[in-house]
A protein has these predicted regions:
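CBM-like, beta-strand-rich accessory domains located in the C-terminal region of large
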Residues: 1-170
Length: 170
C-alpha cells in the first residue's frame, strides 16, 4: 500500500508521489496539498489538489467530485495541469479500486462498466475515455483478497488534460 498505484488516484508514468521507508520519515511527499468541501442544498462538492508530480513532471494534479444528494449519482473530474509548456508526453493512469464482492462487465465500446454488488444493486461507471479492468488486491485485517480496478489510461499534452467520469445506480 506504499505505492500510488495502490490507491484510487492519478499516477503519472508509474511514479509514486511519496516514498516511505520503514524506520525513516517520508523522504519524498507533496509539498502542497489542498482540499475543500462545499455542502449545498442538492450536492456535496469535493475539490482537492497536490503538487506531488511538480518536481519531476512540472504538473499539478486536481480532482473534483460531486455527489448528488437526491440521486444515486457521483460525477468526477481528474485534471493534470502542466505548469511548463513542453513537448514531452507522459503516460498516466487513473485507478478506481473495487471491493472484492463487486462483479464487473465492460461494454463493447469500452466507455462503460457495469458494476453489480453482492446485494444485486447495479451501477454504471462511465467515462468519455476508454476504460479497462485490471487485477487488484484488497487488504483487510492483515488478509488479502483478489479484486479488480477500473483504469483510465492516457497521455498528457503540453497544457491540461481533463478526464470526466461518473458512477450512477441504474
Amino acid at each position: 500500500l506504499r505505492y500510488s498505484a495502490a490507491h484510487s488516484t492519478i499516477i503519472l508514468k508509474n511514479t509514486n508521489i511519496s516514498e516511505i521507508k520503514v524506520g525513516n520519515p517520508h523522504i519524498k511527499y507533496p509539498q502542497e496539498v489542498s482540499f475543500q468541501i462545499n455542502d449545498f442544498e442538492k450536492i456535496i462538492d469535493f475539490e482537492g489538489s497536490h503538487n506531488g508530480y511538480l518536481r519531476k513532471f512540472k504538473k499539478i494534479i486536481k480532482r473534483k467530485i460531486i455527489i448528488e444528494k437526491n440521486e444515486d449519482k457521483i460525477h468526477g473530474e481528474d485534471s493534470i495541469i502542466s505548469l511548463k509548456s513542453t513537448n514531452s508526453k507522459t503516460v498516466y493512469h487513473i485507478r478506481f479500486h473495487l471491493m472484492p464482492d463487486i462483479t464487473t462487465n465492460i461494454t463493447t465500446n469500452k466507455k462503460n462498466i457495469i458494476l453489480k454488488t453482492k446485494k444485486n444493486k447495479i451501477w454504471m461507471f462511465k467515462s468519455n475515455s476508454e476504460l479497462g479492468l485490471e487485477k487488484s488486491i484488497y487488504v483487510d485485517n492483515n488478509s488479502t483478497k483478489e479484486t479488480q480496478q477500473i483504469v483510465i489510461k492516457g497521455i498528457t499534452d503540453s497544457t491540461k488534460n481533463i478526464e470526466k467520469w461518473s458512477i450512477e445506480a441504474i
